[in-house]
Structures are given as structure tokens and as C-alpha cells.
């Protein structure tokens, strides 16, 4: 469960996509909750994440699913094995490995760590074999998806067109320390805003609701919508706990619903 993960909000996010675009770019891909929930269409799709281990994992899922599953067969659900892999990760050794070995070890850290935080063993029994059907489904979904590993500013400038739509789920404000592999700083929130304000296409950004973000995005022609979702981690201790979120865009997020209603008049 990634901090800010969109599993509990993805329907709300998709409902606010613009009615027309030809390029879909997921700038901070993470676990891909929105991409995998988004029906594949004729649009050109890009998944990006600055975490090179994560980008490599998705490339292996897309291009070498059989080899990845073969490696995962031999991953042990044990604290000792997890700690060995975690040590490789902390010492920066994973990028030196063969791509499939690297992907299998990083997936091990995601699957067996507490709250997918990569740090400590989660102690929850889980069979890797049970994930194989999901890996096959993900491989098929990713077949026509471009997978990038770039800084968000370079990516946005590269793919920006009038027909481009960027969905951004950046590290939440004041949670930057959680994303140790990414190095996202307070200044990057400003850099993201400045980059998006200059694009020709459209954007939708998900954020935690806080005064700092509201101030950063208090700009002309910027739409800010309040929304709430279940708090993934707090559910264990406080069932039904809600997490306040903001959806920020350079277009009217209601226009998609309006367009659907207009089309339905002629069905």
C-alpha cells in the first residue's frame, strides 16, 4: 500500500478525466492503480516513474513475464531472505543485476515488506505463485504502454502536445521522506506546478489537502476540487477513517460528465 496510492480513489480520478485526449501520460506511475484501472483505448499511453527499480520491474512484467515468474518461484517468504535482499537494495546493488533478477528482488521487497514500504518484513504469509495470474494480466495490459524512467519535468516537456493529458500523483506534501528512492523535495512541488502551468495539454494532479498545496496552486484558471478517500494504513486501527485529498486541474473536471449527458440525448 503505497503512501497516496490511488486504489481507493481511482474511480473518482477516472471520472474526472477530460472527454478527449490522444496521449495519456502517467507522470508518477507508482503502483499503476489508475493506469491498470483505465480501459485501454486508441490513445498513446506512457507510464513513468523516477524509481529505476520500479520502471525495470514493469518493463520485465511487460517484456519477460515468463522469466520473471520463473525467478519468483524460488523467492522464500522468510525474514532472513527478505533482509538479504533488503541489504542489496540499501547498498545500491540491485541496478547492477540482470534485469529479471533485479525485478524479482524488487518485487520481493514490495510484496513482503510492511505496507509495501520496502524497509521492514511484513510477517504476512503470501505465496508468490498466487500473483502469477495478475502478472500475466499486467503483461497484456502493458503491451502497448511506453515505460519511462525520467525526471517529471523532462518527461512532461517531451510528451507535451495540445492533445496530451497528464495525470500526476506526486509524493504528498510533507511525506517526501517516505520516498527515499525518489528524492522528491519541497522545491519539487513548486517545480511541478511551474512545469504544468506552461504545458499545451491538460493535467490532473492528486494531492493531500493541506494549506501549503492550496497556496502553491492558488492560480488563475486552476480548478481545485476537494474529495476524500479511505486511509489505507489507518484502516487497521480506525475503520472508515477518511483522508482529505485535492484534485487540481487546468480544465473543468465536470466537463466529462457534461459531455456524457449531452451524448446520451441522441442515443
Residues covered by each model-derived region:
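Short loop/helix-cap segments at secondary-structure boundaries that form the rim of catalytic
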Residues: 37-41, 139, 157-161, 213-220
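Short His-Asn-centered micro-motif
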Residues: 27-28, 48, 148-150, 168-170, ...
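Short, polar loop motifs at secondary-structure junctions
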Residues: 29-33, 133-134, 208-211, 252
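Short beta-strand element of Class I
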Residues: 43-46
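S-adenosyl-L-methionine
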Residues: 1-29, 33-34, 40
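Conserved SAM/SAH-binding beta-strand->alpha-helix loop
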Residues: 51
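SAM-dependent nucleic-acid methyltransferase catalytic core
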Residues: 1-9, 16-19, 55, 62-178, ...
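Long, positively charged, glycine-interspersed low-complexity recognition regions
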Residues: 185-267
